[in-house]
Amino acid sequence: MKKLLYLFLFISFFGYSQTPITAANFLTAINICLSTNPVDGLCSDSEYGVMKDWDVSNVTNMFRAFEQRSEFNGDINSWDVSSVTNMVGMFQEAPMFNQDISNWDVSSVTNMSYMFSGAGAFNRDISSWDVSSVTDMSDMFYSAQAFNGDISAWDVSNVYSMDQMFYGALSFNQDIGDWDISRVSFMFMIFQYTGISVSNFDFTIIGWYNNATTIPTNIRFTGNVGFCQSGDLLYDLINKFGWEIPISGSSYSLQSFYPDCSTTGVDDQNQLDISIYPNPTNDKLFIQGLSDATKVSIYNVLGK
């Protein structure tokens, strides 16, 4: 009986001999693990074990955890990050990282500034993240050149800073008009040097204008992108809400295609081989004469 007990104790000790990950040793564990396995973190000989299997549930701060890890691209999707509040610069300048982290529970995170800044390869689906606690998203995707994820459903209603959020995100081209920007105070250069199209920028501005619980005032808003259908609303933001929006004339200015937009109204049907009826309408609108399958978007005079 004693031999069996000793054997059980030995097996128990051997099975749990790895050093637990704590808030105090988290960064040390990363440094030790990646010193031997810088690409995948499969440091089985480390006192902390293989990185993907770490229990990080007690870690609250992941500030710059993988900053400037030029080779790292390890699988950490199974991490329990539900206690983390700070992810500032977590993958900043980690140019190779492009792993699935869609399973992460980020509902406690309040700061994601610089999180993927300079993470040039990252382009994973993070659309399901609960970011409702986040207040700072400034520079979040700064120079994240590959990122073009659909994050249109994010709840950003508590965010106050989006300064340079997509600056240099050359591939980013999404309509994020469903965002409630009511609490935002900073948007300087949010779309500077992005890939956002005229139509997606228009949809974004139109959506923000119509969806905000309260339209924020005195926003400094710049970005060298083009606009068309959102022209009236942009001028409203300038004249009624005090937004500082330079239009044409510098590398930080919006480029106006307004009012010469490639949008067809009911008055154009005589120039085109189509019929649009009835006008006005309260319910249904018919467009007759389109020979090919065509995507049609319909707006009222406010862009809704």
Q: Which residues does each predicted region cover?
A:
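C-terminal outer-membrane/trafficking sorting elements
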Residues: 268-304
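Structured helix-beta-strand junction loops
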Residues: 7, 240-241, 272
